[in-house]
A protein has these predicted regions:
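Hydrophobic alpha-helix immediately C-terminal to the catalytic Tyr-X-X-X-Lys motif of short-chain
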Residues: 158, 162, 166, 196, ...
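Short, conserved catalytic or interaction motifs in soluble domains
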Residues: 38, 185, 249
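Short beta-loop-alpha junction of Rossmann-like oxidoreductase domains
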Residues: 133-135, 185-187, 191, 291
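N-terminal Rossmann-like NAD(P)+-binding domain of SDR-like oxidoreductases, especially those catalyzing
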Residues: 1-182, 314, 318-321
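Short alpha-helical
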Residues: 63, 87, 187, 253-254, ...
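C-terminal substrate-binding subdomain of Rossmann-fold SDR/epimerase-dehydratase oxidoreductases
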Residues: 19, 200-321
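Generic recognition of short, well-ordered alpha-helical segments
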Residues: 15, 40-41, 70, 91-94, ...
Length: 321
């Protein structure tokens, strides 16, 4: 079985690829090594993957259809796991075009490639951000999600709709996964866990939005990967061509509790500055995992404090702090 993972130099893509390589599967990674965040971190991830004989890496942008066709023609994948995207909520306010290019045009290319090469299962990353300002807690796949709070969320909802259309028209088995806030080793420097940890270690003041009245469904990256692997061999049935599922811990954590856990793990106190809610931000996220659990079984969620300690230990070792 040949598997292509786009975004393989990214946080989740790298972690998934490494786990599948440990299972001796043939993995082909595609990533453009975007400078959105530290390219050296991405290259370090790729160098880890290239230690496996069954891994092959392609540096390519998913918006470059000609190059993507060459890669797919060479591999002819059985399964396509699409994790490449322009991430970030706040950055979408500064550089909207990059979201249109990567998340809409790039995803359109992914759908076309899935059609042309008759992939047996397309799995793609959506996001909990599609729930926008939804007041119903926990977030369910049955909730109304047509009022996104930012462009990033709008592109992810668009991906779900585009996938549904292609799946219906061309019988492409596809599964969208709404990831909730992911943390853990090899994490993204632009995300809150890394930003907060770096601020604590450097004794810098942390700007805490909405005066600390936030909660997030923080989900350990290995738990996300467990979910992805369960989905991998279980494409939607013939009469249910395209499906969307939440993947989270199902346990909301207050932001202040998250900061306290990081403080405890490093033995240092954070300097805090409380500010208001920022444009496009969600106050609370919390996954209803019922649909996923019914379809694939319950994920054994990593203990929050254990996950935080594992993340901190990796950070201190990787950055030689």
């Amino acid at each position: 079985m040949k598997i292509i993972i786009t975004g393989s130099a990214g946080f989740i893509g790298f972690t998934l690829a490494r786990r599948l390589l440990e299972d001796n599967l043939d993995i082909f990674g595609i990533d453009n090594h975007s400078a959105y965040y530290d390219v050296q971190l991405k290259e370090s991830r790729v160098s880890k993957l290239e230690q496996y004989k069954k891994y092959k890496h392609f540096k390519c942008d998913i918006t470059d259809m000609a190059s993507m066709l060459e890669i797919f023609d060479q591999i002819k994948p059985d399964i396509l796991i699409h994790l490449a995207a322009q991430p970030g909520v706040r950055y979408s306010l500064q550089n909207p075009q990059s979201y249109v290019d990567s998340n809409l045009i790039g995803f359109s290319n992914i759908l076309e490639l899935s059609k042309i090469y008759s992939v047996k299962h397309l799995i793609f990353a959506s996001s909990s951000s599609v729930y926008g300002g939804n007041d119903a807690i926990p977030f369910s796949e049955n909730d109304f999600v047509d009022k996104p709070l930012n462009l990033y969320a709008a592109t992810k909802k668009s991906n779900e709709l585009m996938s549904y259309a292609y799946s219906s028209l061309f019988q492409i088995p596809s599964t969208g996964l709404r990831f909730f806030t992911v943390y853990g080793p090899w994490g993204r420097p632009d995300m809150a866990p890394m930003i907060i940890l770096e601020s604590i270690l450097s004794n810098k003041r942390i700007k805490i939005h909405n005066n600390g009245n936030h909660s997030r469904d923080f989900t350990f990256v290995e738990d996300i990967v467990d979910g992805l692997i369960r989905v991998l061999d279980n494409p939607p049935k013939v009469n249910s061509i395209s499906e969307v599922y939440n993947i989270g811990s199902g346990i909301p954590i207050q932001l202040m509790d998250f900061i306290e856990a990081l403080e405890k793990a490093v033995g240092m106190k954070a300097k805090k500055e409380f500010i208001g809610l920022q444009p496009g931000e969600m106050i609370e996220t919390y996954a209803d995992m019922g649909k996923f659990n019914d379809a694939f079984g319950k994920i054994e969620v990593t203990d929050f404090n254990d996950g935080i300690q594992t993340f901190v230990d990796w950070y201190l070792n990787f950055y030689k702090v």
